[in-house]
């Protein structure tokens, strides 16, 4: 479980650039790469833009840049991970839609064991594999095309479908097991849910949000001279968000993952 908070842009919903800053968030290592920030799937006026940012430091026995969250027994990783991106909202078939790009970057160090059983201490840094995402609403309010539409927005119960695809162009060295890039294609199909709880009044808004999803992984055919194959990974994220004031909100977050053997 983690705690996050953010600032509400008083111009949110208007055309132009809206900045969403989610800084100083504390994520457990298993959720750092794949967990989307709370309120990410709230709808806004078509033609809007946002710049999400997440920064976290962590230790554990899994590489935070690897979306499969493969646990390495006996390993100890330390890293600082930043996720920066850009999202654009638009209308498609009268439904709210969004396209986004997320770029991971940071540093990672740790003690790992190669497939041949050799122990090694490594340190890497750079850019990971960027992810592109497409999301469209299936159930919920129609796309917001005018300012009055945005002012009347209430999510009620909203259901979306999303598709992610990671592009394997991050920093990668096939001679070492620890990398920020993964040297393989992978992606996710999910169904974001936003459920409004109570009145939709700025300063009092509360939502319960879920993201059930499945990750699919291609093979890394050059992993320290071996081929790495990974089973699908099943994911459920949950966020309970609440306004503290009209311009400040917080959330309680939890995540469950299974698979990726």
PLM regions and their residue ranges:
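Bacterial N-terminal signal peptides
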Residues: 17-29
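Outer-membrane beta-barrel biogenesis signature
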Residues: 30-54, 58-62, 142-155
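Residue-level detector of the transmembrane beta-barrel scaffold of outer-membrane proteins
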Residues: 50-54, 98-100, 133, 160-162, ...
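Residues on the lipid-exposed face of transmembrane beta-strands in outer-membrane beta-barrel proteins
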Residues: 53, 84-88, 132-138, 163, ...
